[in-house]
Amino acid sequence: MNNSSMASEYILRSMRTLKESSDAFNDGDMYYTALRLSETLENMSNVLLSLYGILDISFSPVEVLGFLEISREIDQKVKGIINEIQDLWRQLSALKMLNESPTKAPSVLTRGQEMKLILDRVTSLFDKVQGIFDDFHH
Protein backbone atom coordinates (compact mmCIF):
# COMPACT_ATOMS: atom_id res chain seq x y z
CA MET A 1 0.00 0.00 0.00
CA ASN A 2 1.49 3.36 -0.96
CA ASN A 3 1.46 6.53 1.13
CA SER A 4 -1.47 8.05 -0.73
CA SER A 5 -3.65 4.97 -0.33
CA MET A 6 -2.85 4.75 3.34
CA ALA A 7 -3.62 8.44 3.87
CA SER A 8 -6.88 7.95 1.97
CA GLU A 9 -7.85 5.11 4.30
CA TYR A 10 -7.18 7.30 7.34
CA ILE A 11 -9.25 10.14 5.83
CA LEU A 12 -12.17 7.71 5.54
CA ARG A 13 -11.66 6.53 9.12
CA SER A 14 -11.52 10.15 10.27
CA MET A 15 -14.82 10.89 8.55
CA ARG A 16 -16.43 7.86 10.16
CA THR A 17 -15.21 8.57 13.70
CA LEU A 18 -16.08 12.27 13.37
CA LYS A 19 -19.63 11.32 12.37
CA GLU A 20 -19.83 8.86 15.27
CA SER A 21 -18.66 11.55 17.69
CA SER A 22 -21.26 13.96 16.33
CA ASP A 23 -23.97 11.31 16.71
CA ALA A 24 -22.84 10.60 20.28
CA PHE A 25 -22.92 14.31 21.06
CA ASN A 26 -26.45 14.59 19.67
CA ASP A 27 -27.44 11.63 21.88
CA GLY A 28 -25.98 13.40 24.93
CA ASP A 29 -23.16 10.90 25.49
CA MET A 30 -20.21 13.15 26.30
CA TYR A 31 -17.84 10.31 27.22
CA TYR A 32 -18.30 8.50 23.90
CA THR A 33 -18.06 11.85 22.11
CA ALA A 34 -14.67 12.46 23.75
CA LEU A 35 -13.52 8.93 22.90
CA ARG A 36 -14.50 9.20 19.24
CA LEU A 37 -13.00 12.69 18.93
CA SER A 38 -9.71 11.27 20.24
CA GLU A 39 -9.86 8.54 17.61
CA THR A 40 -10.58 11.17 14.98
CA LEU A 41 -7.47 13.11 16.04
CA GLU A 42 -5.42 9.90 15.86
CA ASN A 43 -6.74 9.17 12.38
CA MET A 44 -6.03 12.72 11.21
CA SER A 45 -2.52 12.41 12.62
CA ASN A 46 -2.07 9.21 10.63
CA VAL A 47 -3.20 11.05 7.48
CA LEU A 48 -0.41 13.58 7.90
CA LEU A 49 2.16 10.95 8.86
CA SER A 50 1.22 8.78 5.87
CA LEU A 51 1.49 11.69 3.45
CA TYR A 52 5.03 12.33 4.64
CA GLY A 53 5.98 8.64 4.60
CA ILE A 54 6.11 8.03 8.34
CA LEU A 55 4.61 4.83 9.73
CA ASP A 56 4.99 4.14 13.41
CA ILE A 57 3.04 1.52 15.28
CA SER A 58 4.80 1.85 18.63
CA PHE A 59 3.50 5.22 19.80
CA SER A 60 0.39 7.33 19.57
CA PRO A 61 0.24 8.95 16.14
CA VAL A 62 -0.44 12.30 17.82
CA GLU A 63 2.88 12.00 19.67
CA VAL A 64 4.71 11.02 16.48
CA LEU A 65 3.57 14.29 14.87
CA GLY A 66 6.38 15.96 16.84
CA PHE A 67 8.85 13.77 14.95
CA LEU A 68 7.25 14.77 11.66
CA GLU A 69 7.63 18.42 12.58
CA ILE A 70 11.38 18.14 13.23
CA SER A 71 12.31 15.53 10.61
CA ARG A 72 10.62 16.94 7.50
CA GLU A 73 10.43 20.32 5.89
CA ILE A 74 6.80 21.29 6.33
CA ASP A 75 5.16 24.65 5.92
CA GLN A 76 3.67 26.79 8.67
CA LYS A 77 0.13 25.74 7.76
CA VAL A 78 0.90 22.09 8.51
CA LYS A 79 2.81 23.03 11.67
CA GLY A 80 -0.22 24.99 12.86
CA ILE A 81 -2.47 22.00 12.24
CA ILE A 82 -0.07 19.72 14.10
CA ASN A 83 -0.08 22.08 17.09
CA GLU A 84 -3.86 22.25 17.07
CA ILE A 85 -4.19 18.45 16.90
CA GLN A 86 -1.79 18.07 19.82
CA ASP A 87 -3.60 20.74 21.85
CA LEU A 88 -7.00 19.14 21.34
CA TRP A 89 -5.51 15.71 22.09
CA ARG A 90 -4.25 16.95 25.46
CA GLN A 91 -7.65 18.46 26.28
CA LEU A 92 -9.50 15.28 25.41
CA SER A 93 -6.99 13.04 27.19
CA ALA A 94 -7.58 14.92 30.43
CA LEU A 95 -11.34 14.77 29.98
CA LYS A 96 -11.36 11.01 29.38
CA MET A 97 -9.44 10.33 32.58
CA LEU A 98 -11.99 12.00 34.82
CA ASN A 99 -15.16 10.16 35.67
CA GLU A 100 -18.03 12.10 37.18
CA SER A 101 -19.26 9.25 39.31
CA PRO A 102 -17.98 5.71 39.83
CA THR A 103 -21.56 4.46 40.22
CA LYS A 104 -22.69 5.53 36.76
CA ALA A 105 -21.57 4.56 33.30
CA PRO A 106 -18.35 6.30 32.25
CA SER A 107 -18.80 10.03 31.91
CA VAL A 108 -16.68 13.15 31.74
CA LEU A 109 -16.70 16.42 33.62
CA THR A 110 -17.28 18.51 30.53
CA ARG A 111 -20.70 19.81 29.69
CA GLY A 112 -22.47 20.05 26.37
CA GLN A 113 -21.38 23.59 25.53
CA GLU A 114 -17.69 22.85 26.10
CA MET A 115 -17.86 19.57 24.19
CA LYS A 116 -19.66 21.34 21.34
CA LEU A 117 -16.73 23.78 21.06
CA ILE A 118 -14.26 20.88 20.95
CA LEU A 119 -16.40 19.05 18.38
CA ASP A 120 -16.53 22.18 16.22
CA ARG A 121 -12.75 22.63 16.46
CA VAL A 122 -12.12 19.01 15.47
CA THR A 123 -14.57 19.35 12.57
CA SER A 124 -12.78 22.48 11.37
CA LEU A 125 -9.45 20.73 11.78
CA PHE A 126 -10.70 17.78 9.74
CA ASP A 127 -11.51 20.16 6.88
CA LYS A 128 -7.96 21.53 7.05
CA VAL A 129 -6.40 18.05 7.05
CA GLN A 130 -8.59 17.05 4.13
CA GLY A 131 -7.38 20.20 2.34
CA ILE A 132 -3.76 19.17 2.88
CA PHE A 133 -4.60 15.69 1.58
CA ASP A 134 -6.19 17.24 -1.51
CA ASP A 135 -3.20 19.57 -2.03
CA PHE A 136 -0.88 16.55 -2.08
CA HIS A 137 -2.85 15.15 -5.00
CA HIS A 138 -3.01 18.27 -7.17
Cite the ranges covered by each PLM segment.
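Charged alpha-helical initiation segments
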Residues: 1-32, 138
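Residue position in alpha-helical solenoids
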Residues: 24, 43, 50-51
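Long, charged low-complexity segments
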Residues: 49-138
